[in-house]
Amino acid sequence: MLTSSDFRELLNLFEKHKVRYLVVGGYAVMKYSEPRFTKDLDILIASDSENANAVYAALKEFGAPLANLTSDDFTQQDYFYQMGRPPLRVDIMMSIPGIRFEDAWGNREVVEFDNMRILFISRSDLIQSKEASGRPLDKIDLDKLKQAEQLDALDEE
């Protein structure tokens, strides 16, 4: 899970700057099901101005390319920020299909890993987002998530 030192450094800076974020996408799928290849770290952030300022400050400290960007860009619901190259690319999104950040934030899962806290979207919110997306890879992820959910339910019996 998140073996890249760059990913860990970025998430530690998000913690330092009190960024409200959730790991979504492939790394979240792996948290709830089985390992799979992912070309990036997908992060959903709250798009309020206070959080946008914190995101910008964390990215600046990280050394991210921010030419022609301001913190206001991170308040735009349709904005998408990308840095790096696969498999170490980071995608920062202000919205994902089928989910409101505030609702997902209330359901977040906190994972303690390698002396750091990582904030993940909940499995149920991830499933809801994958259902809303409809992309072919999301359909595959959705099947794996639902299978893992069924296995977890059996383990609880």
Language-model features, listed with the residues they occupy:
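Compositionally biased terminal segments of proteins
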Residues: 1-157
